[in-house]
Design a protein with these regions (language model features):
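Nucleotide phosphate-binding/pyrophosphate-handling subdomain across enzymes
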Residues: 2-7, 19-27, 108, 260-366, ...
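Residue-level signal for inorganic ion chemistry
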Residues: 24, 71, 114, 143, ...
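N-terminal leader/targeting and accessory segments in enzymes
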Residues: 1-96, 100, 268, 449
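C-terminal helical cap/extension that packs against the catalytic core
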Residues: 45-54, 355-412, 453-454
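Beta-strand->loop->alpha-helix junctions that form or flank phosphate-binding loops
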Residues: 32-35, 58-60, 95-100, 234-249, ...
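Short internal beta-strands
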Residues: 30-37, 217-221, 344-345, 364-373
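Hydrophobic/small residue at the entry helix of a nucleotide-binding pocket
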Residues: 16, 123, 373
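Phosphate-binding loop of NTP-binding sites
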Residues: 25, 64, 75-221, 225-236, ...
Length: 454
């Protein structure tokens, strides 16, 4: 059987599923598509695929596997979905859209890949900035970026790919053999998708599959899962945060070479400085020099909703860290602040453990717990006897901002670092962050109007 005659089912008609089906159809592969839903969005996706000659079945069950040789699955489809369980029982291979994209690219492109519970989008973005500064052709794709199958010709032309991959995408990937691969950290997250933390950690470590001794593996030195994983790798392993690749005496060092002073960077926080080291190592693997890395990092500015100052009034800073959707990210944010904090925690429930956040409550004046998960979080923090922070409850984000404003004092930081997903109120962390900024700026406008009328 030739690859062109291999019949592929693309299951899940989100952005990556649409991209995968189009890429296969445009290249003459036999492809069908399906989705468990029969919603307005699914029907729109099916209509779009019809223009490429791809038939799509909606409200589909395991019957769509009839005559199928393999399945390409969208990241939003959990492993326990009936179609995927049936595929496993029948021995039908399942792969992610990213794995399909790498297959279609072949070996002609140099790939530097990054994953981790927190920081992977930032690292990919920093690497992008460095490669731009170096004038090296590249494409950034995967997870938070454009689907890889939608950029195949552009990637081939550039010759270099910075690839951000999630645990969902890695779950259905076998031995990708990346020239450089980074695992930043592994903390409990997405436990509603993975069977256990051990399974989640194992999926993250798939990023190192298929590497040889000539390849580079980067791992977070301060993360216990990463430190243990480093011991059994085939590639050359570098622990970021200790040894030659570290932050020390106000400088960033990459494998013993001083790169840049922290004071010359446009972003703060130890976790972000270590993110910069990961990005520097990935960019160097793709051909960037030390001087190009320095200039790239000095010119880098953080993406929105990542410790972004959105307002300041009465000596209080209002900081949007809406991208912090798990407790480990909240802990990292609190560890990087030197001022008293009024913290906003909450959102949609993922049943994660907030013990790591509780360890940092000594720097908090108050914690406002809100949304669907707010009750559980506030009950847990109330029981944490070592904390002197005032624990408050609010119904939603707007009420939480008002509570925070009432308690913040000159010199404080009001920090939205929710530690939860946003879907109880918003479409995603971006909309949540934008609403937080709007509320904070609206409060500033009210103060200014009051001052003008005084």
């Amino acid at each position: 059987m030739t690859m062109l005659s291999t019949k592929t089912l693309v299951y899940g008609l989100g952005e990556s599923g649409l991209s995968a089906a189009r890429a296969l159809a445009e290249r003459g592969y036999a492809v069908t598509a399906a989705d468990a839903a029969d919603s307005e969005n699914a029907r729109a996706s099916a209509a779009a695929l019809g223009e490429f000659g791809v038939q799509a079945r909606l409200g589909a069950g395991p019957e769509v596997l009839e005559g199928v040789d393999r399945v390409v699955v969208s990241p939003g489809v959990p492993p326990g979905a009936p179609v995927l369980r049936a595929a496993e029982e029948r021995g039908v291979p399942v792969l992610s859209e990213v794995a399909l994209g790498l297959e279609l690219l072949g070996s002609e492109v140099r790939v530097a890949a990054v994953t981790g519970t927190n920081g992977k989008t930032t690292v990919a973005d920093m690497a992008r900035r460095i490669l731009e500064e170096a004038g090296l052709g590249h494409v950034v794709a995967g997870n938070s970026w454009t689907a890889i199958t939608g950029k195949l010709e552009e990637i081939r032309s550039a010759g270099r790919l910075v690839l951000e991959v999630s645990s969902f995408q890695l779950h259905y990937m076998r031995d990708p053999g990346f020239e450089a691969a980074a695992l930043l950290n592994v903390r409990p997250d997405h436990m509603n998708w993975h069977a256990s933390f051990e399974d989640y950690a194992a999926d993250k470590q798939r990023i190192f599959g298929g590497q040889s001794e000539n390849d580079l593996a980067l791992l977070g030195a301060r993360d216990p899962v990463c430190a243990e994983a480093a011991e059994g790798l085939s590639a050359r392993a570098v622990l970021v945060g200790e040894g030659g690749t570290r932050v020390e005496d106000g400088c960033l060092y990459l494998e013993g070479e001083r790169l840049v002073r922290v004071e010359d960077l446009g972003f703060a926080g130890r976790h972000n400085h270590e993110n910069a080291l990961f990005a520097a190592a990935l960019a160097r693997s793709l051909g960037a020099s030390a001087e190009e890395i320095r200039r790239g990092l000095e010119g880098y500015r953080m993406k929105p909703h990542r410790m972004e100052v959105v307002a300041e009034r009465g000596g209080v800073l209002y900081v949007d860290d809406s991208k912090a959707t798990n407790p480990a990210a909240v802990a990292a944010a609190l560890a990087g602040l030197q001022r008293p904090v009024v913290l906003l925690l909450g959102g949609s429930e993922k049943h994660t453990d907030f013990s790591e956040v509780a360890d940092y409550l000594g720097g908090c004046r108050a914690v406002v717990c809100y949304g669907e998960a707010g009750g559980r979080i506030s009950d847990f923090l109330d029981s944490w006897s070592e904390s002197r922070a005032e624990i408050l409850r609010a119904s939603g984000l707007e009420a939480a901002v008002r509570e925070a404003e009432a308690r913040a004092r000159d010199g404080d930081v009001v920090l939205l670092s929710p530690g939860c997903a946003s879907f109880d109120e918003f479409s995603g962390y971006e909309e949540r962050g934008e609403e937080f900024a709007r509320l904070c700026r609206a409060g500033l406008a009210e103060v200014q109007r009051g001052a003008a009328g005084a």
